[in-house]
Curated annotation (Swiss-Prot):
This is Anaerobic nitrite reductase HBI. It is an enzyme of class 1 (oxidoreductase). Root nodules. Gene3D superfamilies: Globins (1.10.490.10). The gene is HBI. It is found in: Cytoplasm; Nucleus. It comes from Casuarina glauca. Its EC number is 1.7.2.-. Residues 2-151 form the Globin domain.
Amino acid sequence: MALTEKQEALLKQSWEVLKQNIPAHSLRLFALIIEAAPESKYVFSFLKDSNEIPENNPKLKAHAAVIFKTICESATELRQKGHAVWDNNTLKRLGSIHLKNKITDPHFEVMKGALLGTIKEAIKENWSDEMGQAWTEAYNQLVATIKAEMKE
């Protein structure tokens, strides 16, 4: 299902707030992932030997920021472009990494829950069910693109 103009506006409005503190929001995203699914830390080499989210881990900080920024920026561009705007090499890499790490639907659902939780916490009183639906739809479209590449 394509994003509506209103959903696109909600994504962009919230992204304006989120991008003001990508380091904090990206670490929060990973904290929520590990909280919801502690076993998921074994997917990330830089978290395997840790019992908590090491906020001073430079590899985690860098990776988390890239993931968070990529998801959010891609989500805000979906309606305008009509699809995820990843180039072919990026898409192949995303498919390959997710396939290699045996990422399945439950993993994607944990990520979605963590993403929505992170955004809701950051947006505070500006959060709405409509905003949540917009982010859910955008995330689902991005994941569908990755899953399609995983099958190739």
